[in-house]
Each structure stands twice: as C-alpha cells, then as structure tokens.
C-alpha cells in the first residue's frame, strides 16, 4: 500500500531557478498533451457543414483574393514564381506563425479555469497550441505540394526548388520557437494588463504587412527600408521558405542566422516570463 501511495503521489514544489523546465514531468503528462491536441483539432470546425474541409478552403480563398487584388489589380511581382504557389506558400507560413502567436498569447487567460482546478505542467498549453497549428500547416503544405505538382506536370512555369527544401522542418522549428517565445511573453504580460490582449489582433495584422508574405522582399529597393524590414525576424524565414521551395526570395545566411538568434532569445525569454508568471497569475486573472 505504501509503495502504491508513493507511486500515485505527486509533490508540487516551487522552483527557485528562473527557467526550471522539468522535461521528465512534461513527458509524464504526454497523454494529457495529446488529449488537448486532439480536442483542439476536433473543436476547430465542430458543428460545421464542411468540417475539416475548412483547413483547405480558408487558404484557397485567401490566395484567390491576393491573386486578384495584389497580383491582378496592384500588379505586384512574385519574383517569377507562379502567383498561386507564391501566395499559397506565404499564406501557409504566415497563418502558422499568426495562429501560434495568438493561441499562445492567450494561454493563461483562456485556461485560467482549468489551471485553477487541476495540476499539470502549465507549459503544456503553449506546446499544445504550437502542435495543433502544426497540423493545419501540414494540410496547407500538402495543398501546396499538390498545386506544385500540377504546375510541374503541365510545364506552364519554371519552378526551381533547391536542396534547401530538406531544411524546411528546421525552418518550421525556428518559426515555432519564435512564435511560442513571443506568445509566452505576451501571455505573461496580459495576466495584469488586458489592454495588450485587445491589441494583439491589430499588432499581428500590421506585422503581416511588414513581412514579405504577399510581396517579394526584392520589391523593396530602398536600402534603409530593406534593412529595417530584414530586422523583422520573420522576414528572413519567409524569404528562406520561398528560396527553398520555389527558388526565389532574397536568401541570406547572415540574416537567417540573425533570425535564429532572435528566435532562441525570444524563446528563452518567453520561458523565463512564463515560468515566473505561472506561480501567481491566478491571483490577477
């Protein structure tokens, strides 16, 4: 009986270390993690007529709008890449980043009720958000692959995919770390200052237009403005995605390493803020 009681007893302690992340504890709660991921995926389009088809409909509609408005009316270039592929890739990558930032930034506020009732590692929720959106990204990249094969088979446009396509998983990891880190910082701050939560949608929308999602970075010819836009850590990642999968884009190793450095910095700062906030956020939410 004593052995069983010891086995089923969990001792909760407050760590003094700034970034005390217990990976073994996270692994013990892997079933709960998978349960939350499954719940998030199934509830996204629950009680809708088209159901999971919305995973495909949303990016397709966005691409059509961008092709008509920015490609047709505004006449913005796509660096020689087929417009459908150019916009589809940009939309898929940006949607993943935007959704991860938005979901992670609401981790404390939206889950305060369940956090107050049962114990589990709070870090699970940001990880759930990033993983759930990874499924959406996978579906949209699959759609990109189908359209890519159609263009390649028809021979209507020359597409120069590079060997860098093998590095796409690493680019996704960098994007996830950047989004998760930024989201955790915002989530920690919004437990006391809800104004920031209300501003998040505007901030992310503005961020999109400061990132070469629907236009190529090569279109920015002013050197100063080009450098300022490259300081946006999402910009080098977006351009590298385009370079690897479409053979276009303003790829630069120094800027990519800069983006990696910012991603790591924000990720660890996010962990620091998140770990410190989780001890007392229930008193302020």
PLM segments and residue spans:
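Hydrophobic transmembrane alpha-helices and immediately adjacent juxtamembrane helices
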Residues: 1-285
